[in-house]
C-alpha cells in the first residue's frame, strides 16, 4: 500500500461501473478512497458521496466514468478512465483486482459532459465572469410575455437570456463577460 489517496467517480447507469462493484470493495478495504456517485446516492457502496449536483465532477473535469484519480502530497498525480485490470493494479498497487471480471471494458460518458450540462455547470459552479444584474421573474409570469410588455422586442419572438444562454453566446465571441456593449 502506498501513501497515495484516490478519488473514484462512477454512475449506476453505466454497465462498466456496475460491473466493477467488487473492485470498489477491494479498493475500499485496502486504500484511502473517496467514491463519488453521479446519479444514485446508494451506488456503489454505502460510503459513496452523493454528487448528483455534479459540482465535484465539474471541478474534477470528469469526462468518462469510471475515472480513478490518484493524489500524492495533496495534488493529482494521475488518472485512468474505463477499466483495464493491469492498469488499475499498477496504478493502485493492489494486485488481483476483480479476479472474475473481464480484463478490460471502456467506460461511459459522464453526466457532467452531457449536451447542455457543461453550460449549466459552468454558470453554476465555474467562474463565468458575468456580472450583469438579473431581473427577477415571478414564477406565475411568463418571461416571454414580460419581455414583450417591457418593449424588449421588435415584434419577433423573444428568447429570454438565461445565464446558460449568455455564457454559451460569449464562447463564440471575443467580448468579455463584464463588457458593456450598449446602454
Regions of interest found by a model, annotated:
Residues 118-183:
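Metallocofactor- and cofactor-centric catalytic cores in central/energy metabolism, strongly enriched
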Residues 63-64, 69-104:
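Non-catalytic, surface beta->alpha helical segment in thiol-disulfide oxidoreductase systems
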Residues 3-4, 27-29, 37, 68, ...:
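Catalytic cores of nucleotide-enabled group-transfer and carboxylate-activating enzymes in metabolic
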Residues 30-54:
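Thiol-based oxidoreductase modules, predominantly thioredoxin-like and allied folds used
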Residues 2-24:
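Short active-site neighborhood of thiol/selenol oxidoreductases, capturing the structured segment around
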Residues 100-126:
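Long, low-complexity intrinsically disordered regions
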Residues 11-13, 39, 74:
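Residue-level signal for short, function-critical loop segments
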Amino acid at each position: 500500500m502506498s501513501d497515495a489517496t484516490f478519488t473514484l467517480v462512477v454512475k449506476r447507469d453505466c454497465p462498466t461501473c456496475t460491473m466493477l462493484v467488487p473492485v470498489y470493495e477491494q479498493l475500499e478495504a485496502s486504500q484511502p478512497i473517496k467514491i463519488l456517485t453521479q446519479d444514485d446516492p446508494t451506488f456503489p457502496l454505502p460510503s459513496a458521496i452523493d454528487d448528483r449536483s455534479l459540482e465535484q465532477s465539474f471541478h474534477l473535469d470528469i469526462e468518462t466514468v469510471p475515472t480513478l484519480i490518484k493524489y500524492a502530497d495533496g495534488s493529482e498525480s494521475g488518472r485512468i478512465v474505463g477499466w483495464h485490470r493491469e492498469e488499475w493494479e499498477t496504478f493502485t498497487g493492489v494486485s488481483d483486482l476483480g479476479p472474475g471480471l473481464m480484463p478490460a471494458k471502456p467506460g461511459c460518458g459522464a453526466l457532467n459532459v452531457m449536451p447542455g450540462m457543461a453550460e449549466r455547470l459552468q454558470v453554476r459552479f465555474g467562474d463565468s465572469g458575468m456580472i450583469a444584474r438579473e431581473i427577477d421573474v415571478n414564477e406565475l409570469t411568463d418571461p416571454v410575455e414580460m419581455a414583450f410588455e417591457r418593449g424588449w422586442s421588435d415584434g419577433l419572438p423573444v428568447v429570454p437570456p438565461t445565464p446558460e444562454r449568455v455564457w454559451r453566446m460569449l464562447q463564440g465571441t471575443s467580448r468579455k463577460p463584464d463588457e458593456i456593449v450598449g446602454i
